[in-house]
Amino acid sequence: MNNKLNNKVIWFITLIFITACQPAWTLQLKSDRLTTSFSQKEFQELKKEYSETEGCPGLPLNVILDKSGYEVIDSIIYNNLNRGDEEINWQEKGEESCLNKNGQISFGSQKIDSKLITVNEIPFGPDITRILDIAPTVLSALGIDKENLPGKNILEGQFDHVVLIFLDAFGYSRYQQALQDDLLENLSKPSLITMALTVFPARTTVASAALLTGLPPFENGVYETGIRKTEADTIFDLISEAGLASIAVEGESLAFSLNTEVILSGDRDLNGNTDDNVFSNAEEVIKSNMPNFLWIHFHGIDNSGHTYGPDSKQVNDKIAEIDSYFGKIIDSLPDNTLIIAFADHGMHSVNEEGRSGNHGNLIYDDMVIPIIVETK
């Protein structure tokens, strides 16, 4: 008995010794814009912050790349000892990527031991508009101190009213295609239409927190989808503190806590659509109780995109429907109003059971959004 126990103790001590003696790893990353490294210690600290991702026992490589400052990725290149440099298309493989605790990268069943990764980013200039620019623009337009937010003003000037029109999942590539397909009679007219970057992960909860606080995810505390409230001040909080009124017109439920008066718009007519009810509720607010700040959230492009795919006829129909609502809302608004229409993220096609569209990857279709500005 004692010999068996001693053998177990020796084996356990040996295992600890071997583990402790394993060299710490560092992943080297480089692009034309950045050269960074990500250490085993950083991995261990970041792993504590994130919930477990299905199929990835470590951390998604998307998370590592975002944390290291990389934004929109076309591909990565790694060195295969047997075949030389090999390139991986990020749109095709990015969602499968995983950095494991031993420093090994996997793409599903494919394993990569290279500790040097070249990141091919899609280049954007330093002055690219960002979703973080919405909060300072809204606050400045209403004459409220921006409190040293990192973003810039998209448009200067002060207004009696500001309206945010939230076009869920209407990414910039989809906006451009809708223009070519003549679906945008109204959303093509504003004088300021700009390409912009959202935040990672490109999902509604995370993007909502970023646009409402003007702070990036790890500063506002909302860096994954399970977090639905921020401790940071939002534009709703600051507008209320300034003695101004705000109202949010939402779909059938809230993706993120807004801390203001909320009007939910369920599918009252049972037509499988909440956007028509969002529109009618918004019109009622504008006519009877127009606040200083109005938030209008259309969910239909996102809902249809997940079900049928972002390039489907159903999404085209939804885009045309929301475009008509945009034109009618503009006509209804009082003078001296600033209107900002925007997407929280885009969407890419997938072939998964029960789903034909998804988002959350560091790719162009997900990360690049339109911001459309109009004044009245």
For the regions a language model picked out, list residue spans one by one.
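N-terminal capping segments
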Residues: 30-51
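Feature captures the catalytic ectodomains and active-site-proximal regions of enzymes
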Residues: 21-26, 33, 41, 66-69, ...
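Bacterial N-terminal signal peptides that target proteins for export
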Residues: 2-10
